[in-house]
Amino acid sequence: MKTRSFEREIFIQSDAATVIDVIADYSQHPKIYTLIIKVERSKQESDGGKRYCITDTLKWGPFKFKTQYWVDIISVTGDTVYTKVYRSPGTFVTNLTRITPQGSGVLLHESITMRAPDMLFEYAFQKTKATYSEMLERIKGFVETQT
């Protein structure tokens, strides 16, 4: 298994509560991330709170595959969202999102750590980095058109 971390941030013209609500409400995520097909709330809760099963599309060259992963929302406060993601085989991602007021909006800062099997790691890590960068842009666009 390998582990590596990265960070991303973006300025959003909105208030902290709105951004936190969008990030923590996974029923909104199909509007934000186009590869998500379905979001289902699990009847089994995680240790900290809500658990979701996400069905999305994995692109590999000209091929598309449906995949599933699980998201546990560990905690939500007025300025943070902490989640853990599990995708088979043995891939784990933790995400601590912090919201800091800045001027006329907020700075959304994500600290992401991924752990995955050695053979999958480089591919999965690069896809994860690209996905999170794209998601930040989409969150920004979604939130700013809602306010």
Predicted regions and their residues:
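Glycine-rich portal/gate segments that line the openings of hydrophobic small-molecule binding cavities
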Residues: 40-88, 134, 138-146
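Hydrophobic ligand-binding cavity/cleft-lining segments
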Residues: 1-48
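Residue-level signal for tight coil/turn positions that link beta-strands
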Residues: 14, 77-78, 103
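Intrinsic-disorder/low-complexity, polar/charged segments enriched in Ser/Thr/Lys/Arg/Asp/Glu/Gln
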Residues: 3-9, 51-53, 68, 80, ...
